[in-house]
């Protein structure tokens, strides 16, 4: 019975760690992505973030509400 609890705890920890996006904090820029579906075809968001001395960026959000987010670390 104890081994089942330990196994469950380890699986739970792995699930949390896999969704944590290690080393990737995201900074909201307030810049709306041009495509309503969040596709940064011209790489404008990434270029903006690189020019602001971040590690890059991408469009994050949901339909018609995608915003540019820059990556840190």
UniProtKB/Swiss-Prot annotation:
Disulphide bridges, residue numbers: 33-59, 45-68, 49-70
Signal peptide stretch: 1-25
Keyword Disulfide bond set for record: yes
Keyword entries, A-Z: Antimicrobial, Disulfide bond, Fungicide, Plant defense, Secreted, Signal
Main location: secreted
Keyword Disulfide bond recorded: yes
Localization (cell): Secreted
UniProt record, GO biological process: defense response to fungus; killing of cells of another organism
A GO cellular-component term linked to this record: extracellular region
Family affiliation: Belongs to the DEFL family.
Stated name of the protein: Defensin-like protein 34
Native species: Arabidopsis thaliana
Taxonomic lineage: Eukaryota, Viridiplantae, Streptophyta, Embryophyta, Tracheophyta
């Amino acid at each position: 019975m104890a081994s089942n609890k330990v196994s469950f705890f380890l699986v739970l920890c792995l699930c949390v760690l896999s969704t944590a996006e290690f080393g990737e904090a995201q900074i909201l820029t307030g810049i709306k992505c041009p495509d309503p579906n969040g596709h940064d075809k011209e790489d404008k968001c990434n270029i903006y973030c690189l020019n602001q001395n971040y590690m890059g960026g991408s469009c994050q959000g949901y339909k018609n509400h995608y915003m540019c987010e820059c990556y840190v670390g």
